[in-house]
Amino acid sequence: MRILVTGGTGFTGKALVRRLLNDGHDVVALDYKEGIKTEELRRWGAAVVIASVTDTDAVRSAIDGVEVVHHLAAAFRELDVPNTYYQEINVGGTRNVLELARAAGVRRFVYCSTCGVHGNVANPPADEDAPITPADYYQQTKYEAEPLVKSFESEAMKTVILRPAAIYGPGDPERFGMIFRRVAKGSFPIFGSGQVFYHPLYIDNLVDALAAVTNDGVGDGGTYLIADEEYVTIENLVTRVAKAMDREVKTPHLPFWPLWLAGHIFEKVCQPLRITPPIFPRRVDWYRQNRAFDISRAQKEIGFHPAVGLDEGLRATARWYQQEDYL
């Protein structure tokens, strides 16, 4: 089967491309810039198209002969772009790919949204019908594209929406890198109680879900939260990262609000200069917002059963960070 993966060089995209190739599919990966990762995808056997999802001619060419689209490409919390950029890529780009997919006779369209559309979960765990309260333009525009995707659902082209939790694992130095690096230093300051919930999602588990909904009749027209079996408190997560690294870690508790104020000040100062602030509000919110989800719908309807548990995933991630000298 010929499959298009947009955002093919991203953390999730790259892992999905490899899985689909290993499963015997013919894969086209679309991404907006050339680099080491695109060369790696070519070595694996994927066709690579360098273009934005807003480039109609390039996407039309990439989608020719494709049966299934996995739409993963997104503008993800870019510091030095206007908010209209999120609208252009996450909503406009999605519309462009949808329209071209329908015109090309694509029979399945899988849209990768985010659990972040639910914002701070008031009564954890949240299911798919919990309130939609996005906290930033990334989350807002990812949600705005969801009804757009549903509007293209038809007998000819089935759609599926996945809302992944906090993705981590070997192959990505950023998402959990901060946690591992601080633990490696032996001290992880916790601002606030440390008792808010956080819901990890190991990369292989997410790829299993994406591979499942590639198949006809799996999840047609549905929206699914995708996360690991277990959600944990921030403090417990830090402790288990330390265990995975075979390290001792101190977790001193500090007041939250001074950090929150500093985050807003740094963002205001750094944004006009187009530099990344050392602290910013989204990262500060990690210490105070609940992120915990009910995955029972995905378990029942698409057969999603996370194969890799938290401790196993953390150990594998720790080994990769150490091998790649990120710690």
Where are these regions (language model features)?
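Amphipathic terminal alpha-helices
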Residues: R297-K300, H305, G309-L327
